[in-house]
C-alpha cells in the first residue's frame, strides 16, 4: 500500500457516501434497520438477485416478523415460506440460528462479533453486514459486488478467489470502512454493495455514471472490463431425473419428504430420482420409485420435462403419471411419505421443479382417479 498512485481510502469513502446517500434504492429491508431485518435480507441476498428477493423478504417478514416467531415455527413452515428461493441450507440455518438466539441470547441478536460468528450460518461477511448496517460498527463486508469494486478501484490483477488476494481485499475493505466517519460504516458498506450491483457490474461497467471513476485505477488504465480476472469456466454436468406423479383411489397424490441433510433437505416433492448413465426414462421411473418408496409402478402419460440449473450441475426433470402395480409406499430412501389432495399440494414446501409439475397438472386437469388397472383398496 506504499505505492503513491493508490486511491486514498478517505477519498473513496467520501465519494461513495455522497453518492449512496443521494441515490440508494428504496428496498424494504432498508426501511427498518433492526438486526433481524438486516440478517434475513443479507442471507436471502446471498447468490440471489435483489428483484427476486424482495417478494420473498416481504412474505417472510409477514409470517416471521421477529426472532421468536421464527424460532417457534416448524421446519416445514420455514421451508414452505422459503420454497422457490433456492439454496435451502440458508433457510435451515436461519431457523437453527433463531432457536439458538432465543436459547442463548434471550431472543436478541448479539452485537458482538465473536458471538455472531459462533452462530450457525454466520460467516465474516454476514457478521460484518449485521454489525455495520444494524449496529453502526466499523466492520467491513466483502461479497461478490464489493470484491469486484475493489479489484477495479485498486486494479488488482490476481485471482480474487485466491487466499492471498482474499486477505488483501479484506484489508482494503477494512481501511475503507475505518476511513469513514464513525456513524457512517453502514452507509459506506451499503455504498460498496450498491455500486457493484448497479454500476460497477460484471462485463462492461457504467464508468460514466460511477461516483468513484476518477479515483479508479482500472478505469485509468483502461482495463476495468478485465477486472477482476476470470477463471476459465467449465460446463456443469447435466443429469436426467424422474418424478413420478402417483394417485391413489381417492385421487390423492403421493409426496415424499427429502432427508434433512443434503440438497433440498427437508423439502417435499414427487417420488423419483436421478437416472443412471444409459438408463432410459421409463426404466428410471420404475427403478427410482421402487428404491425410494418400495412401489412397483408403470409409467404412463408424460406431463412435462423441466430444465433446471443448480450451482454446480444442471438437470432435466421428466414428470410422468405412474400407475401402481404393487406395494404400499414406505420411506425407504426418504424421510417420510404422504398422500395429499390436489388442493393441499401448494401448502407444502416444494422445490421449484416440483412446483412447476403442480402447475402443469393444474393446466392439464389431471384425472382424480388412478389410471385403469390401478389399486382398488
Where are these regions (language model features)?
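Acidic pyrophosphate-coordinating catalytic loop
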Residues: 233-237, 261, 306-318
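Intrinsic disorder/low-complexity segments
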Residues: 366-377
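Catalytic cores of DNA base-excision repair glycosylases
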Residues: 3-8, 13-221, 294
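Conserved hydrophobic/aromatic beta-strand scaffold that supports enzyme active sites
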Residues: 209, 255, 317-321, 337-339
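The catalytic Nudix box helix
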Residues: 270-304, 341
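NUDIX/MutT-family hydrolases
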Residues: 321-364
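N-terminal strand-loop-strand
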Residues: 224-269, 298-301
Amino acid at each position: 500500500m506504499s505505492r503513491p498512485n493508490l486511491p486514498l481510502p478517505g477519498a473513496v469513502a467520501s465519494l461513495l457516501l455522497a453518492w449512496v446517500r443521494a441515490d440508494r434504492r428504496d428496498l424494504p429491508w432498508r426501511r427498518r434497520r433492526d438486526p433481524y431485518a438486516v440478517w434475513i435480507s443479507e442471507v436471502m441476498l446471498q447468490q440471489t438477485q435483489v428483484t427476486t428477493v424482495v417478494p420473498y423478504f416481504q412474505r417472510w417478514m409477514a409470517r416471521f416478523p421477529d426472532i421468536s416467531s421464527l424460532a417457534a415455527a416448524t421446519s416445514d413452515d420455514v421451508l414452505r415460506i422459503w420454497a422457490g428461493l433456492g439454496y435451502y441450507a440458508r433457510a435451515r440455518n436461519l431457523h437453527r440460528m433463531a432457536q439458538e438466539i432465543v436459547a442463548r441470547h434471550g431472543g436478541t441478536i448479539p452485537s458482538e462479533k465473536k458471538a455472531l460468528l459462533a452462530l450457525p450460518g454466520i460467516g465474516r461477511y454476514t457478521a460484518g453486514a449485521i454489525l455495520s448496517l444494524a449496529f453502526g460498527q466499523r466492520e467491513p463486508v466483502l461479497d461478490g459486488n464489493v470484491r469486484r469494486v475493489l479489484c477495479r478501484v485498486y486494479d488488482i490483477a490476481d485471482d480474487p478467489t485466491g487466499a492471498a488476494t482474499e486477505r488483501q481485499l479484506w484489508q482494503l475493505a477494512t481501511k475503507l470502512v475505518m476511513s469513514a466517519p464513525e456513524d457512517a460504516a453502514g452507509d459506506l458498506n451499503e455504498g460498496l454493495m450498491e455500486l457493484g450491483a448497479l454500476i460497477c457490474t460484471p462485463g462492461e461497467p457504467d464508468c460514466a455514471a460511477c461516483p468513484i471513476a476518477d479515483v479508479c485505477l482500472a478505469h485509468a488504465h483502461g482495463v476495468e472490463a478485465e477486472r477482476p480476472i476470470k477463471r476459465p469456466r467449465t460446463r456443469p454436468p447435466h443429469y436426467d431425473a424422474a418424478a413420478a406423479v402417483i394417485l391413489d383411489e381417492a385421487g390423492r397424490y403421493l409426496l415424499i419428504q427429502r432427508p434433512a441433510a443434503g440438497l433440498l433437505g427437508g423439502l417435499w416433492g414427487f417420488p423419483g430420482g436421478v437416472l443412471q448413465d444409459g438408463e432410459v426414462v421409463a426404466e428410471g421411473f420404475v427403478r427410482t420409485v421402487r428404491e425410494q418408496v418400495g412401489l412397483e409402478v408403470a409409467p404412463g402419460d408424460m406431463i412435462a420435462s423441466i430444465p433446471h440449473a443448480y450451482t454446480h450441475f444442471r438437470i432435466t426433470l421428466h414428470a410422468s403419471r405412474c400407475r401402481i402395480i404393487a406395494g404400499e409406499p414406505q420411506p425407504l430412501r426418504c424421510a417420510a411419505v404422504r398422500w395429499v389432495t390436489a388442493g393441499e399440494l401448494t401448502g407444502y414446501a416444494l422445490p421449484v421443479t416440483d412446483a412447476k409439475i403442480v402447475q402443469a397438472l393444474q393446466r392439464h386437469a389431471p384425472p382424480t382417479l388412478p389410471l385403469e388397472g390401478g389399486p382398488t383398496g
